[in-house]
Amino acid sequence: MEEPMDRWAGSYVVLITYADTIGDEGVPGLQALKSFVNRHLHAFAAVVHVLPFLQSTSDGGFAVASHTNLEPRFGDWSDLAALAQGRRLMADLVLNHVSASHPWVQQFMRDEQPGRSCVLAAVPDPCWADVVRPRSSSLFTQLRGPKGARQVWTTFG
């Protein structure tokens, strides 16, 4: 096993990209990305950081709908493993943003675990009016369930 200091070097070039940045009609995004990196960047990019690739509903992949399934247009887990061959792979672990269709939110709305513990309802507080953000959508979204209407933080709207 590598020592922690051997995992990264200041000389590494890191390619940061979305899985579908390289378009090749009819080819899953991760396969097209692997082909492009192998053909053009193999000698340079020691690390490929693939921005959110899990199944999502919006927000550039950050509104995660499933933490176990890849976005179908990107390919599947074997495509991600193939991209990792011969290089280091980096990914965002998006736990603090989920889609309303994510199982945790659906469980929260039914007052079931684990969603009940994963989604936090907001406690009304006048200080929320002081939150400044670069979005026009509401800071909170109302969800209805067995406990009635509850407000949850909405990062992206």
Residue ranges and their predicted role:
Residues 1-157:
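Acidic/aromatic-lined carbohydrate-recognition and catalytic surfaces
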